[in-house]
UniProtKB/Swiss-Prot annotation:
It comes from Actinobacillus pleuropneumoniae (Haemophilus pleuropneumoniae). It catalyses: L-aspartate 4-semialdehyde + phosphate + NADP(+) = 4-phospho-L-aspartate + NADPH + H(+). This is Aspartate-semialdehyde dehydrogenase. Substrate binds at Q163, E242, R269. The gene is asd. SUPFAM superfamilies: Glyceraldehyde-3-phosphate dehydrogenase-like, C-terminal domain (SSF55347), NAD(P)-binding Rossmann-fold domains (SSF51735). PROSITE patterns: ASD.
Length: 286
């Protein structure tokens, strides 16, 4: 039975993964070992009745070297720190990652098996050991219109995405809820009075959003009652990195990096917890 290490299993993505693995009875076929960045030595969680002993230190390269497979949902900073150190030891196990840090590496494959199973299978034959989850909106787009790409019918795509707080992580989801709570509290009395002016309510809400004390540490701006047409950092091209991913990751997933299809658009963060939405304009070849 293979030793499989899990890092970042308590976060938003990790929690969903654990639930799914329990549903699919995946723990029956592995020896799970759980790692932590802050609570090493404490009791490990029990999934599907399997006692995994104590939590291991997620930065302990010697412990990580013992694993056949590593599944990490810890984020890009962790990957950037640990992955090169682990590979430098000669470790030759499988690294499966939800973060974006390794997506565009030459020896990594972005996994979207309903669309690029042929790329995954070829990579396994060629000894690829690093597999990375794709960008959320890129994956959704290809699940929706992947058949058009497969039939070589697409000349270009323009996409507008409307992305929930969950795409930025659990801390951002909490911040959105905190923002919602503060806005509601600021006009609680007015909302209880049907005769109160909606314009006055709106003015008070806007004033609250502009206060220095309003919680924006994670998003950098109010999201509750608003939206943010900017996700990730600015690139030299003038795109945000999230917009660039639509082009770069789409073509890598499809194995088209040498003859890429243009993909561009606008990515907007909206005040929803987990619901993403997209709108496409597609030019077809026929």
């Amino acid at each position: 039975m293979q030793n499989v290490g899990f890092i970042g299993w308590r976060g938003m993505v990790g929690s969903v993964l654990m639930d799914r693995m329990v549903q699919e009875n995946d723990f029956a076929n592995i020896n799970p070992i759980f790692f932590t960045t802050s609570q090493a030595g404490q009791k490990a969680p029990v999934f599907a009745g399997k006692d995994a002993g104590e939590l291991k230190n997620a930065f302990d390269i010697e412990e990580l070297k013992k694993l056949d497979i590593i599944v990490t949902c810890q984020g890009g900073d962790y990957t950037n720190e640990v992955y090169p150190k682990l590979k430098a030891t000669g470790w030759n196990g499988y690294w499966i990652d939800a973060a974006s840090a390794l997506r565009m590496e030459k020896d990594a494959i972005i996994v979207l098996d309903p669309v690029n199973q042929h790329v995954i299978s070829e990579g396994l034959k060629n000894g690829i050991k690093t597999f990375v989850g794709g960008n959320c909106t890129v994956s959704l787009m290809l699940m929706a219109i992947g058949g058009l790409f497969e039939k070589d019918l697409v000349e270009w795509v323009s996409v507008a995405t409307y992305q929930a707080a969950s795409g930025a992580g659990a801390k951002n989801m909490r911040e959105l809820l905190s923002q919602m709570g503060e806005l509601e509290a600021s006009v609680k009395a007015e909302l209880a009075n049907p005769a109160s002016s909606i314009l006055e309510i709106e003015r008070k809400v806007t004033a609250k959003m502009r206060e220095d004390s309003f919680p924006t540490d994670n998003f950098g701006a109010p999201l509750a009652g608003s939206l943010i047409p900017w996700i990730d950092k600015l690139l030299e091209s003038g795109q945000t990195k999230e917009e660039w991913k639509g082009y770069a990751e789409t073509n890598k997933i499809l194995g088209l990096s040498d003859n890429p299809i243009p993909v561009d658009g606008l990515c907007v963060r909206i005040g929803a917890l987990r619901c993403h939405s997209q709108a496409f304009t597609i030019k077809l070849k026929k």
